[in-house]
Amino acid sequence: MPAASAEAPSKIVALGDSLTAGFGLPDQEGFVPRLQAALADGGIAVEIANAGVSGDTAADGLARLDWSVPPGTDAVIVELGANDMLRGIDPKATRDALDAILRRLTQRHIAVLLCGMRAAPNLGAEYGQAFEGIYPELAEKYGALFYPFFLDGSAGDRSLTQHDGLHPNAAGVGVIVGRILPKVKELLTRAGSQHPS
């Protein structure tokens, strides 16, 4: 076998909203390029497709799932729900959409990392519990990897957040990538076992 046809890079799709898309940041400073660079620095060859669309809800992500995650995809990072929460959408609707996303990806034997989100305190304890409980429940249901809070390390820190108080700045993205990196490596290991060469 010629050396040129050595193991191809794993293909990941990052399915999300503006937090995945890199809202308000230069092209190379968003989550996807920074994550790909961090993996490359560790000697891990991977191609990450940025399927982040600003403003998308979980239902929007479901509606475009099939064309956002093409054949040959090894793994998907699912980061959806923040816009549902900000709009006060019924957590049941968010859960139903995320459930359908995970079900379809599982049926396709694609490894999944589900990223959780936290509800704003002003939505109340009942909403917060219902919303935040969606993620661990579905991760367990489908055997997906689970990262409890996508914005871990940057949320609430003004020095790591853009002026809107919601989206991470470049430094914030660096923190997010650093914290989620071990879980993404675990995802790639799982993807390799689901797609034996």
Question: For the regions a protein language model found, what residue spans apply to each?
Answer:
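Conserved G/P- and acidic residue-centered "switch" motifs that form tight phosphate/ATP-binding loops
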Residues: 16-17, 55, 81, 169
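Serine-esterase "nucleophile elbow" of acetyl-processing enzymes
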Residues: 2-54, 64-73
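Short, low-complexity, intrinsically disordered N-terminal peptides in bacterial proteins
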Residues: 1-9, 190-197
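Flexible, glycine-rich phosphate/dinucleotide-binding loops
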Residues: 21, 57, 121
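Acidic/histidine-rich helix-loop elements
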Residues: 24, 49-57, 86-89, 165
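Alpha-helical cap/lid subdomain in secreted, periplasmic
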Residues: 40, 44, 60-197
